[in-house]
Amino acid sequence: NITKARLHMDYELSDGEKCIGELEREDKRLAQSVKRISDATGFPMVKLDSAEYFSVGEEMFADMCKELEKAEKYIFAEYFILQNGKFLNTVVDIMAKKAAQGVDVRIMYDDLGSIATYSLADALKLGEKGIKCVPFNPFLFIKSQLNNRDHRKIMVVDLSLIHI
């Protein structure tokens, strides 16, 4: 399942309080909620410069591949599920090419989300291509507590483009 949004972000982190102040003038209750979340997580609010919505994943995929080809510094990705197929194979081919050009390429995937679709051996193969790949939030059968799993699909390219 590919979420259909491309976000261009303004990453002036010092602007967090300024953004909350602007939001407060429009919606005081929402600004209070955002401030609480920002304070609790340590992540400041950032102002969205622009966003593009894709109604179908295929359109987003074509745009994402084009943007990956432009990467100069880094590509960071986080996925709940990794599974070999057209999407991942195409993205990995581009990432491997960029890694060979000196781009820092990293992928994290949820251990449980990918338990039946992606193995540690698959992750090691990415390492051979210059892509740093690690599972996170390992699934432990002996844990009986609730876990903090999400279904994120995030790709950041050179801190200026995010596909969510």
Give the location of each predicted region:
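N-terminal localization/anchoring segments of enzymes in phospholipid and broader phosphate metabolism
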Residues: N1-I162
